[in-house]
């Protein structure tokens, strides 16, 4: 119905212009024909006093092997409804370098020019791009990406750390569909030189990497690794791009960095949520509110309101159900029962489970 009304509005506007006397006019402007895309709407409430920020920490531009300018990459992120974007062009792989001549800081500098207008936090990063076993490594919160352009990848990591960088091991299952934790990664983790793992990259995720995050206390990360145009890459009517949800003390670059180093993140991939038990529990409790309508013995009727746009798949009393975003449902429960959130992942074989009694 809205589309029909809008179409009739446009038709009437253009008809009026067409029927009006045009003789002698230089230009006829039709501003009502311009309807800017309003973007994706993903609402997740703040969690336990922290600011909930939607982030993409892995993106590319024409300054490495991406298809669009850094400024446009930032505007795409704004349209996606993100709060934070990191520009992480490849250090070693720059197929456009013959006709786009610039150093490794230029893409961030250009992205930074639209930070204020876009209302995003723009972070400088870079991707150390080597073959396995070390693979690809993102360094975030850099001050000089040129310092990473060295022969030894371990020296590049150290140079990033000297700038106070957050180090993320990218897409561990790419390109050979095997998420092996090599000795080089174990050594870097032991030395506290890897802080997080990208458990989701673009259209795939790596269940073994969930286990690595839990075992070693690393931050769960998920990003698009976008190279092309976002609207040509993602069917946003089906699923939005993957993102890292960060719980920050403040909405600032410093706040984001502190949160990542502290491990306060959950990864969103469609309706799948991946993170530590603590962070998943905090997120679910922030999104869902409960009201006990009536109690009869060990049975209760509970009204559940989902304040977020996230959809939660649950298993309760061996029955599957869905709590849709921005919806309210009434559920009959036993007070000694447990509810499993089946689209959450802590490890490859563990989900978030909550005692019903703890929700009262």
What are these regions (language model features)?
Residues 172-174:
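Conserved catalytic scaffold of divalent metal-dependent phosphoesterases
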Residues 4-13:
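Sec-dependent N-terminal signal peptides
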Residues 12-13, 68, 99, 235:
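Alpha-helical transmembrane segments and their juxtamembrane interfaces
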Residues 33-163, 170, 179, 192, ...:
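A metal-dependent hydrolase metal-coordination microenvironment
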Residues 16-20:
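Sec/Tat signal peptide C-region and signal peptidase I cleavage site
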Residues 2, 21-55, 74, 134-142, ...:
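Charged catalytic cores and adjacent phosphate/nucleic-acid-binding surfaces used
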Residues 165-167, 220:
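Generic beta-sheet signal
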């Amino acid at each position: 119905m809205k589309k029909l009304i809008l179409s009739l509005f446009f038709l009437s506007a253009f008809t009026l212009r067409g029927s009006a006397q045009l003789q002698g006019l230089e230009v006829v402007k039709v501003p009502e024909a311009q309807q800017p895309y309003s973007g994706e709407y993903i609402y997740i409430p703040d969690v336990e006093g922290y600011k909930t920020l939607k982030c993409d920490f892995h993106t590319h531009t024409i300054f490495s092997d991406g298809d669009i300018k850094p400024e446009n990459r930032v505007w795409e992120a704004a349209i996606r409804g993100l709060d934070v974007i990191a520009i992480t062009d490849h250090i070693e792989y720059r197929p456009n370098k013959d006709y786009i001549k610039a150093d490794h800081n230029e893409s961030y500098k250009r992205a930074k020019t639209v930070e204020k207008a876009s209302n995003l936090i723009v972070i400088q990063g870079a991707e150390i791009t080597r073959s396995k076993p070390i693979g690809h490594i993102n360094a975030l919160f850099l001050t000089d990406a040129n310092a990473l352009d060295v022969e030894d990848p371990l020296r590049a990591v150290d140079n990033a750390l000297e700038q106070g960088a957050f180090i993320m091991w990218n897409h561990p299952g790419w390109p050979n569909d095997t998420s092996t934790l090599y000795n080089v990664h174990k050594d870097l983790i032991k030395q506290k030189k890897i802080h997080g793992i990208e458990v989701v990259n673009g259209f795939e995720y790596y269940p073994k990497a969930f286990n690595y995050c839990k075992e070693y206390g690393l931050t769960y990360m998920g990003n698009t690794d976008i190279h092309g145009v976002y609207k040509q890459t993602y069917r946003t009517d089906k699923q939005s791009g993957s993102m890292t949800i960060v719980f920050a003390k403040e909405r600032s670059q410093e706040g984001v960095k502190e949160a990542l180093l502290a491990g306060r993140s959950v990864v969103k991939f469609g309706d799948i949520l991946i993170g530590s038990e603590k962070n998943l529990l905090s997120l679910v409790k922030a999104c869902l509110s409960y009201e006990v309508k009536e109690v009869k013995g060990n049975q209760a009727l509970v009204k559940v309101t989902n304040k977020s746009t996230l959809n939660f798949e649950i298993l309760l009393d061996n029955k599957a159900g869905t709590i849709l975003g921005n919806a309210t449902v009434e559920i009959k429960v036993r007070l000694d029962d447990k509810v499993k959130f089946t689209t959450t992942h802590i490890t490859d074989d563990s989900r978030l489970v909550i005692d019903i009694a703890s929700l009262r």
